Structure formats: C-alpha cells, structure tokens
UniProtKB/Swiss-Prot annotation:
The gene is valS. GO terms for cellular component: cytosol. A motif ('HIGH' region) lies at residues 44-54. It catalyses: tRNA(Val) + L-valine + ATP = L-valyl-tRNA(Val) + AMP + diphosphate. Its EC number is 6.1.1.9. This is Valine--tRNA ligase. The keyword tRNA-binding does not apply. GO terms for biological process: valyl-tRNA aminoacylation.
Amino acid sequence: MSEISKEYNFKEVEEKWIERWDPSVYYFDWGSEKPQYIIDTPPPYPTGNFHIGNALNWCYIDFVARYKRMRGYNVMFPQGWDCHGLPTEVKVEETYHITKNQVPREEFRRLCEEMTAQAIERMRRTITRLGISTDWSNEYITMKPEYYVKTQRSFVQMYEKGMIYREDHPVNWCPRCATAIAFAEVEYDTRTTTLNYMRFESDHGCLEIATTRPELLPACVAVAVNPNDERHIGFVGKSVKVPLFDYEVPVLSDPAVDPSFGTGVVMICTFGDKQDVRWWVEHKLPLRQAIDREGRLTEIAGKFGGMSITEAKKAIVDEMLSRGIIYRQEPLEQNVGLCWRCKTPIEILSERQWFVRIYPDVIIKTADEIEWVPEHMKLRLKNWTGTMEWDWCISRQRVFATPIPAWYCKRCGEVMVAKEEWLPLDPTKTQPPVSCSCGSNEFEPEEDVLDTWMDSSISALHVTGWLSREDPRYPAQLRPQGHDIIRTWAFYTILRSMALVGVKPWETILINGMVLGEDGRKMSKSLNNFVIPEEVFEKNGADALRQWAALGGSPGSDVMFQWKEIVAASRFQQKLWSIYRFAAPFASDTDAPFTQIDRWLLGELGMLVSKVTDAMEAFQFDEAFRAIRAFTWEVLADDYIEIVKSRLYGPDSDERRAAQATLYRVLDVLCRLMAPFIPFITEEIYTSLTGKSVHTQSWPSLETYTSPEGALIREIAAAIRRYKSERGMALNAPLSGIEIYTELELETFDLRGVANAPIQLRKGQPEIESRAVAVKPVMRFIGPRYKDQAGKIIKKLTSMDPADVERMLASGRVEIEGAEITPEMVEIVRETLSMGEAVDVLRLDRATLLIRRSS
C-alpha cells in the first residue's frame, strides 16, 4: 500500500474523481426489472449561476438518489432547465440596454437563447463539481422543440377538453414587463404611501373619501358606503361628482366597505384591487380603463393622459391641493402587490387573455393522496387553493416562451387552435394548413406566448415518458422543491397532471427551506451576506458543503449558512482521513473469531445502520448524518481504536486478526453509509480499501451482535482514561495493577494495553477499608471568623491525628484555642486500603475497579 498523506487533500481527491467517474452509471434503464424511483427534479431558471439555495436542494435530491440506488432501485435523477419567461428576458434587456419592442422578435429570442445556453453550461459545471449524480441522459431544455412540443400538445388537449378558454377579464399586469402575470406570481411588500382625504361634491352635500390611488380618479365608476354606517347612508342611491374630472357616479351600499378605514367611504375604480373587481361584477358597473399596458394614463384622464402612473399621481395631487379638494394627508403602511421578477407595483387591467380553468376540489383531493414531507406543508397548498377566485391566466405578452399555437381568422375573427399533429410550430412563422370554417385562408397569428409555468408544470409527465414512450411510468416517485413555489410549481403540476392523464404527478413531495445568510437574513449581495458554491469548493471542498446541507436542518425548515459549520465539516473529514490512515495498514477482509469488544463495536455499528436507514426513509438527513458523525468520532475513534491499539501493534494472533477484520468491516459499512452524503472522500477510502467503487455497492445490512462484556470493557477503558486524565497522567502512563470485580467473564488483553498495567479479574465485591490520613483546614471559613487566631488554629489542626479530628467532628464539637471548629471548616483527607495497601476505587454499574498506582 502506498503511503497515505497525513493531511486530507480535498482538492486533489475531488478533482480526481470528477475526472474518473463514469456518468453512465447513473442512467435510468427503461428496460430494468428493478423497482423504479423517478425524481421530478426542479428545472432552475438558467439566468445566472447555480446559487447556494440550489446547492441545498440538489444535495437533498442527491442524498435520496444515491441512497435509493444502493437500496436496489432503478433511479432517474434527471436535470431540466426552465428556460422561458421573464427572468431571461429581463436579463437580456438589462445586459443589452434594450426592450423587447426595440429589436425584431427573432433577434430578441436569439439573444435570450444564447444567454440561456451560456448559463446552462455554467450551472452544469457547478452541479458536476458538487458531486451530484445526475442522469444526464434524461436532461431536458424547455426552449428546445422536443420539449415545448409537449407544452403545446398539452395546451391543445386541455383546450379540446374545455379546460382552456380565451376571454376579456381583469388580470394582474406588470407595466414594466408589459405582460399579464398570474396571482401566484404576485409578491407582496409593505410600503409607506399617502392617504389623501378629498371631497366628492353633489347637490345633496359633499361626501368625504380617503384614497391612496388618486391617479385612479378617472377610472372611478362608483362610490360605496357600509349599509350600517349611519353617517353616510343618506347618500345611497344618489350621485356624486368625481373631482377634477367632473362626471357623476352613483353611491352604493355594500357590507364589504370598512367603516373604520379613512372616512368610511371608498371609491370603486376599474381597477385598484381585487375588491374593486368583486364590486364591479356584483353591481354590474361600467368599465373605465385609465391605465394602459405600458403603465401610462389613457385619454379618459384628459390632460393627464400619456403620463406615467408616478407622474400622474403627483400632478393630480398637486392640482387637487392647490384647489383645496384634498384637505388632509397622512402616511399609511400598505401591503403592495409587486411583479415577482422586477418588483414593479402591479395594476389590474381588463384584457383579453387565455385562461386555464381551476378545479380547487380536484387539486385538494389529489394533494391528500400525496405524501408531504414535512406534512404541514400541505396546508400551504390547501390554503392557497382555497383562496383562488380567478382562473389561471396563461398568456403572456412577451417573446421568449412557448408560442400559443393559435390564429385568428381575418374575415370572421374565429379562433383556430392547432391540431396536435401540426406541432411544434410558431404561429408567427407558420399558417394553418386548413381554411377557416368561413372559407377564408387569411389569419392573424397569436403573438402572445405561454406562461413559463405551462412548461415546467408538465415536468413530472415529461420525465415519466408522457407522449414520448408507449410505456409511460407516471406517477413519479418524488418531487423535491422549495416551499416558496408550492403555490406555483406544485399547484400547477397537480392541476395539469390531473387534467391531462388523471393521475397524481408524484407519490411524495419533499419540501426544502430557503438559505439564509450568517446574519439570519435572506441571502443578498446588497446585504453582503451572499456566498456562492464555488467559494466553498475553493476553501473547503464539495463534501464540506454537502455536510452543511445534510446537517443544516430537517426538510421544510430554512437553513442558515455558517462558515463555522463548513470548517467543522472539514475537521470531520480530516478525522475520518486520520482514522483511515491509521486503520489502512491493519484492516483486512479476513476470518477470525471476534472478541468481546469487537462484537460490541459491530453491535453499535448495526444500530447505526438501522438508525441511519430509518432516518433516510423519512428524509431526515440531519439525523442520519449526525448519527454517523457521532459514531465515527466517539465510538470508533475515541473508544474502539484506542482500546485495540495494543492488539493491532502486537504479534500475529487470532485476536489481532479479529481487530483487523473488525476495522475492515466497519470502514466498509461506514463508507457505504456516508456515500450519499460525502461521495468524494468515501470513494477515495473505499476504492483504496476494496478496489471497488462505493457508489456501485448495496446499502449495508448487518447481522445482530450483542456483547454486554464488550460494553463493560468500553466502560472500564473510558473510566481508566478519565482517571489518568483527571490526575494529569499521560494516557500511556503505567500503573502497578488493576483489580476488576465483576460477575461478567471479561477478556482482559485490550484492557492491559489501555491501562498499561497487569489486570486481575475477580468475582464478588472487594474488601476495602477507608482511613483518615490528613486534615485540611478550610481557610475561607476559618479566616473571616477568627482573623488573628486563624494561624494558631490551622497549625493546631494540622498537628492533630486526623482520626481524632474526625471523631470529634462526628460527636458534634471541636474546640481549639477557645475557638469552636464546625464541620465546614475542616476537610478530612481519606485513603482507601485493600489488604493493607493504598488503592483508588472506581465504581461502575457492573464493576468495581481497584487501582494501584506505580510507586
């Protein structure tokens, strides 16, 4: 065996195995008879780098994938890329200082595709460097025709089932991105705004209203009061004039009006929020659209038309203040809906869009058929589903996304949706091969594209072979994902799977948390708490980062990144390497009868295998790896190896060969247990030990070993080491001898080495006596009480026979130089004797030790 370096070189080891590993080992075998385990891997947006949050999630997935392979499953761990959508478009616009409307449609898409391809290549490198066992044979890229043809076919199938429709409806709109977005894509933030109090005049007096959106005055279609609010109920059924814009609107009563907010009177605009939409529908109000797709006021705003929302708000407020219409202003903290990508406040516009029908009962029923880890995360989906009021808006006014396969007849306006056999296609490039029902052959293409969630929500169907294989394998076994996209990716995937194939998408959904910086806040470059995986790779290696992921917390909980945990992980790897370096020359796959301490260790190892297996089945990675660490450091290194060192260094014997065989077996099993977590160092150790790859081995199982004698030997060895340490002795310091009194028949050869002393094993209990040998005055009690007399008292006490002092204290009174001495003022030093010789006694539950020190 070549010499093993003292220090573990993670860079050398990790780079070596990245070069040597054959990725085909991880490929899914469609013809295998093994039970399948298909993972619906999250396809990240390839817009930047593979960040630390991705690393956490992919570590979780890899722990499962490697474990399941070792348990005999045919595992598919594919890698997908969710290319389309706003993230890439926004990045292109920022990078090239353009908007989607400033360059030809095809040129803008080309820029998006190029940027996406570059990001995918960067992220692939990081995934590989992290040691992820990806099945690259099942990689998918949603911007490629072979994937988005399935998105288009799913659109056509759902349209033909009546689950997709097109109509005018209020939608969330981002003025900056100039596109509709779904409610699930709206983020909320608390912002300080201004509540403006103003007067709406009428022939019956004025009605005072408070609003934070004066720029929506030209969109006002009614004013509402609570029917139980006696202050304003007299205005109901009458009209008031909208200030500045001089048109009348009716005053309505509605129980949804909050009498305690502002003046208790609200203006209903089309649209300020979802409540406005409810009132608009319920009261059959007219539509006045004051804001256009670009976030500018329309012509109904008169002289304010063409202004941006911000400009118009300021101009309208300034004029109303100058005319005395606004009579009061006050700050207000308000929850504002924002575009999930660019953080621009959203508007609600009435637009003709494409929608998917939502069936909440079906989604909730299906969610109940899926195992959720942790279970409480299911409530997030149920709560979100229970609040759904509108169907899913799936059309987007962008470029880089799956084209909606539809056209509009120029003559009659009829919608023509493509047939499945025509797909894939882009309607802006391809005309339908058939005429319209009216006989016309002239069509306008649908230029809107699909929401990117229409791509990723069929990922579970795609990886299980839907539309591409005659033997699709749905449902998948696992969906791992973050809790932040339960209301989007999880929700939409369940919806689409049930709509398209009537089967739940997966058997289990595993939820991971978010990664926080060391300050406990969300990671952000602006907060200077941002860490990238490559920084950890360079300083400590991939295995250290994977340990942090395993130990960071249980699934579902947010995880704080801490460099001290990375450093601790590196220390553990060095400890593991040191164990291997010590054991390698001795470890041997040989047959020999195990000794008591060997059987004890194998029993502990068996319990570890059971504990880790249970934890892995429950996705409790922290429990699994914490148990492995504790066993490796405390049981194997601190206990067993220290106990058997003398046996290993001794001459050849059955006992020595038993220790060698035990070390071999323990290293073999430990490497297999740790392989899903730290694949690099375990591969290095295992191949050196066995000549085989640990990642092609099965999960360990052990016969049951029990050895109460071995457990007692470990306890005695620990007591002897503790005894020496407490007395400042070297652990290899010799002792004159040790007598062990116990009812168990112990093997003593290892204890002789631990104690560096002859060992005598005896039955029963030792015959010992105790005597007082010295008196130690306690100055902290004597000094303060007797002050100047203290010296004489102490001198007298130390000159007395300790046995006499002890007897006098037992009688309740000692008087010296006229001073009363109480028990707390004196410590009696005793020694224990056995057969007239001084000994130290160590009492354990199942044994008593008499220790004779060296003279």
